[in-house]
């Protein structure tokens, strides 16, 4: 008896199996659709696949070419209340890249409008980036948002930095920064189009400045910056450049006798060594003041007595020292000493845009790429909060904000004068706005040296403290609305090169009526042990 072979079972298949085989072959013959990031309105409504080109094939076959447009994306939560016409426009891949135009800032009273009207143009190669267009009712708010976008989307993002550099453990020198190639590249045939555009802007800016009345020079009365701005201090002072509109960082100076005699109008006599430092041996106490002896000058005496309990006392000053010190020319600081002057004289908002711009340039020249990326990310957290708080503010609102700042600063100055804690106040862009006499004694920098020019709080901090500064800033200003934070260790740089003051710093944040960070008060106490 014959048994059926196994091949008989393979060949004698039923009709259902052959139909499935033919269906599989037809699927393989079909062309695969290319995925697209954005579907059209018609395909999105029916939840079917779409194409990148417009009109798509499905809309052509259905006769819906007139309505075949990209479906709108879902808005983020902080953009929910903004009309579509005021939202950022997506850059299409076929659009040519746009050039970068960085405005040159002038800190005169009518310069804020000139800066705000220049607009922002950015050069992006990725279609996911956005081009900023005016979306605020205030020119000051729109200008500040533009510079925040410039900080975030400039060549400081991680996707613009090679992976091996970003995540390498090698410590780059502080001088190797992003964007320094422009300083080293020779002029002539190697000049980039952006540099050519910047040169045209500088020429136009110089022509406009010719019609502006001369601005009083900060150092005309006291030549405080003749040696404190680095090797080119004398040239900077001789050029009469506007130190409020242009930023030159403070640079510590070598001191042979570890004193501040190099910048005092009446320096101490070098022959009288320790007799000038008031010292009470019975109670182990030093007496300091802002005129003759400051805390950085006690570094060597305190080191000799590190095994003993030592106290520091401030000598009583004249009653005139408690008077409110205001200066009309210091737009970033306290300008008036009465509330009536504040409300009647301030008729323009304070522009934070130049401060953010020069802060970024300063950080580029001081830190490496990896540190700079982390700092820019901390600044980037401020952008959505700024949109939510400022989108409905008008120019009059921004003027009122500056009046609130000056009025609040006036009250704080009266209160700070009654206490002995070293205190420094700075704006949200890091620009120092006020210091008391105790802070002068603690760090060695005088009030005129810090406020007679554009000075940032990070200038007088060491590198590690600057890194902690931006971490603390993102906590106290953008995340935690309690308004207070503590830096356990903050190292302040003194005018004496190599002399660092170890402090503990307590932050207190003051917000304006819209919720934006208005000012930051820093209370510094020295760590003696």
From Swiss-Prot:
Family annotation (Gene3D superfamilies): PAS domain
Keywords attached to this entry: Activator, Cytoplasm, DNA-binding, Gluconeogenesis, Metal-binding, Nucleus, Transcription, Transcription regulation, Zinc
Disruption phenotype: Increases the periodicity of transcriptional and metabolic oscillation.
The keyword Metal-binding appears for this protein: yes
Record's compositionally biased regions (Polar residues): 14-23
Any one GO molecular-function label of the UniProt entry: DNA-binding transcription factor activity
Pfam families: PAS_13, Zn_clus
Region Disordered: start-end pairs: 1-31, 174-198
Subcellular localization(s) per the UniProt record: Cytoplasm; Nucleus
GO terms for biological process, alphabetical: carbon catabolite activation of transcription; carbon catabolite repression of transcription; cellular response to starvation; gluconeogenesis; negative regulation of transcription by RNA polymerase II; positive regulation of gluconeogenesis; positive regulation of transcription by RNA polymerase II
Residue ranges, compositional bias (Low complexity): 174-193
Keyword flag Ribosomal protein: no
Annotated PAS domain residues: 408-480
InterPro entries xref list: ERT1_acuK_gluconeogen_tf (IPR050335), PAS (IPR000014), PAS-like_dom_sf (IPR035965), PAS_13 (IPR056751), Zn2-C6_fun-type_DNA-bd_sf (IPR036864), Zn2Cys6_DnaBD (IPR001138)
Function: Transcription factor which regulates nonfermentable carbon utilization. Activator of gluconeogenetic genes like PCK1. Involved in restriction of Ty1 transposition.
Similarity annotation: Belongs to the ERT1/acuK family.
Name used for this protein in its record: Transcription activator of gluconeogenesis ERT1
The species this protein was found in: Saccharomyces cerevisiae (strain ATCC 204508 / S288c)
């Amino acid at each position: 008896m014959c048994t059926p072979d196994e091949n008989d079972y393979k060949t004698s298949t039923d009709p259902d199996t052959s139909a499935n085989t033919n269906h599989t072959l037809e699927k393989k013959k079909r062309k695969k659709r290319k995925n697209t990031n954005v579907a059209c309105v018609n395909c999105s409504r029916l939840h079917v696949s779409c194409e990148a080109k417009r009109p798509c094939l499905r809309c052509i076959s259905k006769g819906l070419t007139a309505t075949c447009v990209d479906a709108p994306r879902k808005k983020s939560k902080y953009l929910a209340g903004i009309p579509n016409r005021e939202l950022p426009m997506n850059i299409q891949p076929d659009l040519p890249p746009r050039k970068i135009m960085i405005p040159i800032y002038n800190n005169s009273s009518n310069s804020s409008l000139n800066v705000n009207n220049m607009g922002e143009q950015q050069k992006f190669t990725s279609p996911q980036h956005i081009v900023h267009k005016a979306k605020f009712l205030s020119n000051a708010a729109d200008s500040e948002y533009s510079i925040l976008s410039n900080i975030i989307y400039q060549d400081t993002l991680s996707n613009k930095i090679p992976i091996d550099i970003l995540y390498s453990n090698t410590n780059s020198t502080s001088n190797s920064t992003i964007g320094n190639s422009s300083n080293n590249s020779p002029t002539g045939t190697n000049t980039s189009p952006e540099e050519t555009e910047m040169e045209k802007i500088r020429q136009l800016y110089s022509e406009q400045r010719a019609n502006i009345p001369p601005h009083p020079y900060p150092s005309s009365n006291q030549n405080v910056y003749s040696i404190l701005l680095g090797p080119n201090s004398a040239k900077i002072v001789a050029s009469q450049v506007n130190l409020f509109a242009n930023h030159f960082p403070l640079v510590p100076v070598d001191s042979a006798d570890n004193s501040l005699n190099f910048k005092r109008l009446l320096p101490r006599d070098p022959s009288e060594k320790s007799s000038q430092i008031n010292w009470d041996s019975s109670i182990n106490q030093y007496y300091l003041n802002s005129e003759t002896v400051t805390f950085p000058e006690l570094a060597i005496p305190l080191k000799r007595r590190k095994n003993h309990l030592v106290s520091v006392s401030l000598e009583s000053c004249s009653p005139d020292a408690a008077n409110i010190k205001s200066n009309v020319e210091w737009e970033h600081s306290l300008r008036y000493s009465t509330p009536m002057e504040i409300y009647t004289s301030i008729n323009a908002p304070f522009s934070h845009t130049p401060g953010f711009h020069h802060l970024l340039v300063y950080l580029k020249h001081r830190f490496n790429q990896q540190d700079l990326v982390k700092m820019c990310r901390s600044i980037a957290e401020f952008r959505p909060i700024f949109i939510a708080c400022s989108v409905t503010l008008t120019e009059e609102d921004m003027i009122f904000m500056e009046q609130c700042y000056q009025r609040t600063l006036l009250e704080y100055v009266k209160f700070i004068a009654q206490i002995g804690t070293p205190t420094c106040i700075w704006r949200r862009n890091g620009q120092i706005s006020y210091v008391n006499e105790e802070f002068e004694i603690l760090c060695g920098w005088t009030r005129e040296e810090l406020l007679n020019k554009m000075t940032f709080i990070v200038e007088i901090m060491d590198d590690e403290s600057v890194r902690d500064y931006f971490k603390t800033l993102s906590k106290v200003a953008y995340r935690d609305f309690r308004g207070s934070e503590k830096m356990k260790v903050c190292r302040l740089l003194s005018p004496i090169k190599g002399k660092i003051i170890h402090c503990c710093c307590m932050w207190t944040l003051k917000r304006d009526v819209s919720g934006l960070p208005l000012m930051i008060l820093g209370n510094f106490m020295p760590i003696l042990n």
